[in-house]
Amino acid sequence: MTTKYELWYIDMIKKCKSYRKEQKITQSEVADGMHVYQQDICRMENCSNIPSVIKFMEYLDSIGLKIVLKEV
């Protein structure tokens, strides 16, 4: 069963993928910045391999984004 947090995480990954493409950043460029293989980025963006929070933050950094927390 997928939790609401997993669904949110998957949605964030998809939005980040769209942003990366808008910025014309390739998966290879992201992979180089993260010191992983291009295939790892492909799997992450297609949600066949959900990254740890640390890897997701590295991904965000490599495409020029960051997480901002706010009180709810």
Question: How should each PLM-predicted stretch be described?
Answer:
Residues 14-29, 58:
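Short basic helix-loop element that most often maps to the first helix and adjoining turn
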Residues 1-11:
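A detector for short, charged/polar N-terminal pre-domain segments
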Residues 12-17, 40, 52:
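Short alpha-helical segments used as structural interaction elements across diverse proteins
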Residues 52-70:
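DNA major-groove recognition helix of helix-turn-helix/homeodomain DNA-binding modules
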Residues 1, 71-72:
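Short intrinsically disordered terminal tails
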Residues 24-42:
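Short alpha-helical DNA-recognition segment
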